[in-house]
Amino acid sequence: MIKQPKGELTIQVVAMPADTNPSGYVFGGWLLSQMDIAGGVFCRKVVKGPVVTVAIDSTTFKCPVFVGDTLCCYVSLIKIGKTSITVHIEAWVNREFEEESNIKVTEGKYTYVKVDEDRRPVVIEK
């Protein structure tokens, strides 16, 4: 059975040498940052306004990311609250020259809050 990503493809970015640690693996912080960006892009579209990250509720690292991997972040809606929106984010890599070329590397649950121009929480209209 071929595993498929769940959610909307929100961003794609190639991992570069500057994103790695001395062992040659991409930093977990870089990966979290890309996932956070993807979640923010998705949530801004859903709530029709700016959002800020308030929680990374969970993250599971499944396997490493290497230089040259194309990181693809998929986002799906979990729930919308009064001022917050919670999403599930899956990070997959595309390794073009390997037999298993589409690999889930990380997933997590992120929560964002819609804010106004003064950066205060505002009600999300449903």
Language model features by range: what are they?
Residues 56-58, 107:
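Extracellular/lumenal ectodomain signal focusing on beta-strand-rich modules
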Residues 3-9, 66-67, 78-126:
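HotDog/MaoC-like acyl-thioester-processing domains
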